[in-house]
Swiss-Prot record:
InterPro entries: Metalloenz_LuxS/M16, Pept_M16_N, Peptidase_M16_C, Peptidase_M16C_assoc, PreP_C
Top-level taxon in the UniProt lineage: Eukaryota
Chain coiled-coil ranges: none
Lineage: Eukaryota, Fungi, Dikarya, Ascomycota, Saccharomycotina
UniProt-recorded name of the protein: Presequence protease, mitochondrial
EC number(s) per entry: 3.4.24.-
Function per UniProt: Degrades mitochondrial transit peptides after their cleavage in the intermembrane space or in the matrix, and presequence peptides; clearance of these peptides is required to keep the presequence processing machinery running. Preferentially cleaves the N-terminal side of paired basic amino acid residues. Also degrades other unstructured peptides. May function as an ATP-dependent peptidase as opposed to a metalloendopeptidase.
Active-site residue numbers: E87, E160
Cofactor: Zn(2+)
Gene Ontology MF, one: metalloendopeptidase activity
Amino acid sequence: MLRFQRTVPRVAIRRLANVYSEGAVLHGYKVRRAQEIPEMRMAAVELEHEMTGARHLHLEREDQNNVFSVGFRTPPPDATGVPHILEHTTLCGSQKYPVRDPFFKMLNRSLANFMNAMTAHDHTFYPFATTNQKDFANLRDLYLDATLRPLLRHADFLQEGWRLEHRDVGDASSELVFKGVVYNEMKGQVSNADYYFWIRFQEAIYPALHNSGGDPEHITDLSYEDLVAFHQNHYHPSNAKTFTYGNFPLRDTLRKLDDEFRGFGRRAIPQMHEKPLQLREAVSVEEPCQIDPMLPADKQCRTSMTWICGNPNDVYETFLLKILGSLLFDGHSSAFYKKLVEETGLAYELSVNTGVESQTAANFLTVGVQGCTDVGQVHKVIMETFTALLAQPFEKHRVEAILHQLELSKKDQKSDFGLQLLYGILPGWVNNTDPFDLLSLNSALQRFRADWDREGDGLFQRLLNKYVIGKPSFTFTMVGSSDFNQVKDQNEQSKLKAKVSSLTESDKEVIYKRGLHLQELQNSEQDLSKLPTLTTADIPHSSGHYFVSRDGPITTRQTDTNGITYIRMKRPLKGAIPYDAYPYIPLYSDGLMNIGTLLEDASAIEEQIRLHTGGISVSIGVHPNVETRLSELYLEISACALNSKTQYVFDIINKIMNETALSVRSEKMKVLIRAAASSFTSYAAENGHDLARLHTGAHFSQTQAIMEQTAGIEQVRHMNNLMSIIEKEAEFNTVLQNLEAMHRKIFVADGLEVMITTDNRQTSDVVKDQALKFIAGVQQSAGAESWLPEKYSRRALEKPYPALLQFPFQVHYTAQSTQGVSYTHPDGAHLQVLASLLTFKHLHREVREKGGAYGGGATYNATDGIFNFFSYRDPQPVRSLNIFRNAGKYVLNEARWTADDLNEAKLSIFQRVDAPISPSSEGLLQFRHNISDEQRDRRRQQLLKSTLDDVRRVADIYLVQPSPSQHMSAVVGPELPREVWSSQWPVIKV
């Protein structure tokens, strides 16, 4: 059997080194150096543009998912968010593409599987990834013109940044309020308690690096003139770092870059001056934060201690620090997790800033906690633990486990490998760290192994003595304040009042007319003919088929896995879990992997997993049947290991599943519950629209109703209930005993299947034998009662009012759901096209541009048959719900969609359908979701053949004709003013 491996032949790498030899000049670029990186099957070339000094890094690899990025060093001068707002406004039109918002227009004129722009703490970059060479050229052209020659119109600054505008734009008597996309985005961002702690910590320890995203209290100080000046000072080729990855010709990109850059000339770039605090003595900072409703009143503190540990430009020492950080902080066996969380119960979880982080000109080593009471005792235990570490050797197997994970990370081929390399390189590269050093993992590992063999623990003890023991620290603490959000609101209103009071009547007239003008611009039709586009002719008519072989309970696939074997298991649960036990599913899954077994604690199990495998996970998945939409629950286990270590996977899974201690290790279970509770509010602040969608979708779908119990607002309420009984021994033990009983019915051989993905027949045969022996050793049947999916009823539909899911945020999230059809029904494809058209041709304008929400749109869940609307970080949630409610009528009565619009909608869908997948995921859709290649092909043709008449027909059937009670809505966020919402809305408080 002929097997084709996607590798970079050494001959090709040598050819690359010959073409791009040091000193060679190509299209205005001089080659600085070229280097083979065999462990990644890749070659790297660094070049410098002779005229401007712009640097380019190319990573040549036989990967069809090519990446391009242009980035600039953009240290913020203040907290107004000027780098962030500039990132938005550069993408609102350029000299070559003078249409409004070409970036969002290109989202559905392309087959790119990734397009974005990102503002980091001291740099801004614009990456995309695509497998289509024509698409690559189109997007590269758009990104370069957008960043170097943006129009930066005042109207775009007002829309994307901030503005004063009447609440009702058409009513000059309505109150003036702050509006703006970034303004509302950051109000939502600071509602995330983890982010707020992290950003305030960063600002305190590194005051020279301001909040690049922008503090809502300061965003309204930014002027349009400041924005334009910041672009002129920073967006210049001499300050640029460009990046390419993949197998497209480098020459084409160099030629294009030279054409774009040569008119700029060379400019002196200001040297980096941003330095962190100079800790000549200990520094302590304390600030208030919002109350976390998931935590007890006496656990509303977060605190951390930080030491500054050299410069990231010393790549090897930074590498050592990160290994040390993993030993100190990662996992159950780490010293600080044990001392601060597990053994003493001083806190619920380690803090978000715990670890080793490289930030511009400094490495920080930080250890902190959240959910604590006695801050002084936490700091005392931290210092005692560091001192004890000097006398206690690190276990050799823990170090070997870390090295094993690093080795696996080089071999594990992710579909976004190029993007991940970019994310790892760019922060150091913009701050003068050698990118080749950042790529040379092998040399760092070899040097470390030699040093570790020679010095052992002395290697880490030297670092602790150099930077931590007896050295000044920076302590940062936040304490929950009951009036925190009220104070924030008052500050906003005071600032608004001050700005409004300074306005003359003439100013107010200008603001009113400006608001009308902006609305007129937002409503205007754009001439998109200047924008490049692909067509449906560029979409392959058949999708990739991944051949799998099935023999009894074993499914196998051979592909290029680079020496790794991936193992998946599934078992239909049928009657194993009664529906009233569904809220316990997350605790069950978490407990299996994190409390240990009867004979070994969690630390021992975790170290075995890290030392011998690439990871093992156990979960309960719920998937709708693609024909009937009835829910099907599965036990799902995923793992991977080097081809030579697959037996460890089965041995460890057998140990976890057959020797579980769910009802024995009660104290460890309490630790897990507290940690989950301490992180849920931050999760909700990032995913409020998902919580809303689960709540509304639960009215129409068994799958969504179950997920509402396991991951939605019902899980929040369940978690609160667990927290209330956690110290009531009898009640809590009953919970654990029920989990144990549930487990005995879940893990049986009846229906158990295994999928093996590896790169050669010999390994496949070996692992197949291991899997069959594993199945034979599992209990055959649990005698579970029959469970019928239809027994899990959907929510009653008698209350068509939106529900308010109340959280202490500064902005809202919304969702509206309605019933669709099954995956195999032909209308499903038309509904998916409708969702894309509504998003890009209606909702983006109405919800984001006019309404000021950070995001909004429509989605169609193809497997579950639910049509969803959503908005994200939305200052006007009720307005958005009204837009959603009338969307069907808009399609029938107002939309003037064209064949080009339909073409673009299909392109946006196939970006996701045809996005590259990793070798480990090939064939997984068929194994896990029971969707065959034939069903995928049939749906593909339905999507390609969908017409505008089809779209209008399904809009009428599924959006217009259903009664109001068949459209369910929800809002996540703070209480709404009574004048904008109905008292009939049910309110669900966390």
